[in-house]
A protein has these predicted regions:
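FIC/Doc superfamily catalytic core
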Residues: 1-235
Length: 235
């Protein structure tokens, strides 16, 4: 992965703000266009907009703001408190299973046989993936891999994917990488994610897709000289 530095990554996140929120919101059923989403995020809600879409966007913005304020304060890390606070912000309207903490009931995932980590094992599971993340030497890549673990294990009653996406964006930026987001209602990504849930051997397939998305975002912000270096590193 191509590192661009913290300040530049923050600039890119700021420029992509509406797009990042839009992609994540599409995964949750937002019916607005990108333009309507941008207008709503700026405080001008279009006519005939569904209330639940407005609430969804407001919650995602709150989650985004929380993370990026912590980054600017040099105080953003992957830990349970930050993770749970983020879910409380982004899922305040639809997570009724111990909001602000790990879920207390088992869940089902539409289209998948996988049901997430069993409730008695959530704390142990989080400890294990935290150690895995901090021990992982694959700089940058480990952040995207962590995203997959957070999605698959389903630590919350609702809002797992949106929480994980914003955490991923924040960790990427804090480490000096360009952020990116995915609409998991897209058939290609929806299928890849479900396949990964049901078969751990499919992890590399979706990981490569996600890394390619991040690469394309990075390339779109590089100048000619940087692109040349970027392509040389790829070779």
């Amino acid at each position: 992965m191509y590192k661009i530095g913290l300040n530049r990554a923050l600039m890119i996140a700021n420029k992509m703000f509406e797009k990042l929120i839009y992609d994540i919101s599409l995964s949750e059923g937002n019916s607005m266009t990108l333009l309507e989403t941008a207008s709503t995020l700026s405080g001008k809600v279009p006519k005939n907009t569904r209330v639940k879409d407005v609430v969804l966007l407001a919650n995602l913005k709150n989650g985004y703001d929380y993370i990026f304020e912590k980054i600017k304060e040099n105080n953003f890390y992957f830990d349970k408190e930050t993770f749970c606070t983020e879910n409380r912000l982004v899922a305040s309207n639809d997570n009724f299973d111990n909001l602000g903490g790990f879920r207390q009931h088992n869940i089902r995932i539409v289209g998948a046989k996988h049901t997430g980590v069993a409730v008695p094992n959530l704390e142990k599971s989080f400890f294990e993936i935290s150690n895995k993340y901090y021990d992982d030497k694959r700089v940058g890549i480990k952040i995207v891999d962590l995203f997959l673990d957070l999605c698959k294990n389903k630590y919350f009653g609702k809002g797992n994917t949106r929480t994980a996406q914003l955490m991923m964006c924040g960790l990427l930026v804090s480490e000096g990488y360009a952020p990116f987001s995915i609409n998991f209602k897209d058939a290609e990504y929806s299928e890849a994610l479900i396949n990964f849930y049901d078969d751990e051997n499919k992890r590399d397939i979706i990981l490569k897709k996600l890394l390619n998305e991040q690469k394309e975002v990075t390339k779109s912000f590089l100048n000619k000289d940087e692109l040349k270096i970027f392509k040389e590193k790829e070779i």
